[in-house]
């Protein structure tokens, strides 16, 4: 693996990282004081250069920030979510506070995602209040609220293929597929026998979703037949905090865990574990694969560091 570019952020514990879909080398990180248990949060916008990582903008919020998503129609705009139940809309072109705050959830908001299809510009949020909300960022209140989960919601992700369709993962051990047009659940999958902390859609197959759970396993689900997973990936030794499909390889994905590692997988291979990266000393919570560079990965951890690097398995063909 090439040497990681590292930025240490004293007193801030990383929860989420996401590359800009527009600007190569720009990365956003959502972080919290005191491991997110108390204190404030910070949105960090970073740029890469020859000397490493530099902070372009830093925005503070009065509660921990748990997730971040870039706008799909404005390179300067991001949305974060926080422990006080609110979402924040930020403009990196301005060094001021949020342009807008959306406050409807009654508990921590752990997940936020901007729609991937060009048909609409919507944001989905998932909360510990057991609800999912869909927002038009230009409107101050949510468009609709989705109920059905029986525990906290950890992950909400739009389909990159089907407009208005999103997945959610919950402490109730289910993966659920929803449609904004019906405001009801389409599919309920009892995907694990433990809490599910993350899910993601395959970029190359509209029917394939992956889940990562407290049972240390990753499972792939074909939405046309959900009786059993189409793959299971084992190797992590503690809960899987986040999972991301590759934008460049149909069967490659990455996962990060409370075992301090990031692992890379190819579920189509007999020996699917491609590489294990061990460069953090605390829970690794944030993870993203660059949309601009096929080899570049970013992660962040409770060890107060943000890293960008090129794992060997993505730089070697096959």
UniProtKB/Swiss-Prot annotation:
Q: What happens when the gene is disrupted?
A: Mice were born alive, but display a variable degree of dwarfism and hypotonia with decreased motility, hampering their feeding. Perinatal lethality is frequent, although some mice survive beyond 18 months. In the intermediate zone of the developing cerebral cortex, increased neuronal density is observed. Increased neuronal density is caused by defects in neuronal migration. Mice also show defects in ossification of distal bone elements of the limbs as well as parts of the skull and vertebrae.
Protein localization: Cytoplasm, Cytosol; Peroxisome matrix
Q: Looking at the Swiss-Prot or TrEMBL record, what is one Pfam family this protein matches? A: WD40
List the CDD domains hit by this protein, alphabetically: WD40
Task: Give the molecular function GO annotations.
Answer: enzyme binding; peroxisome matrix targeting signal-2 binding; protein homodimerization activity
Q: Which InterPro entries match?
A: G-protein_beta_WD-40_rep, PEX7, WD40/YVTN_repeat-like_dom_sf, WD40_repeat_CS, WD40_repeat_dom_sf, WD40_rpt
Could you give one GO CC term from the UniProt record?
Answer: peroxisomal matrix
Keywords (A to Z) from UniProt = Cytoplasm, Peroxisome, Protein transport, Repeat, Transport, WD repeat
Q: Where are the WD repeats?
A: 60-91, 104-136, 148-179, 191-222, 235-266, 279-310
Q: Which GO terms describe its biological process?
A: endochondral ossification; ether lipid biosynthetic process; fatty acid beta-oxidation; neuron migration; protein import into peroxisome matrix; protein targeting to peroxisome
Where would you say this protein principally sits, based on its record?
Answer: cytoplasm
Q: Which domain of life is it from?
A: Eukaryota
What this protein is reported to do is described as:
Receptor required for the peroxisomal import of proteins containing a C-terminal PTS2-type peroxisomal targeting signal. Specifically binds to cargo proteins containing a PTS2 peroxisomal targeting signal in the cytosol. Cargo protein-binding triggers interaction with PEX5 and formation of a ternary complex composed of PEX5 and PEX7 along with PTS2-containing cargo proteins, which is tranlocated into peroxisomes by passing through the PEX13-PEX14 docking complex.
UniProt family annotation: Belongs to the WD repeat peroxin-7 family.
* Subunit: Interacts with PEX5; interaction only takes place when PEX7 is associated with cargo proteins. Interacts with VWA8.
Protein name in the entry: Peroxisomal targeting signal 2 receptor
Encoding gene (name): Pex7
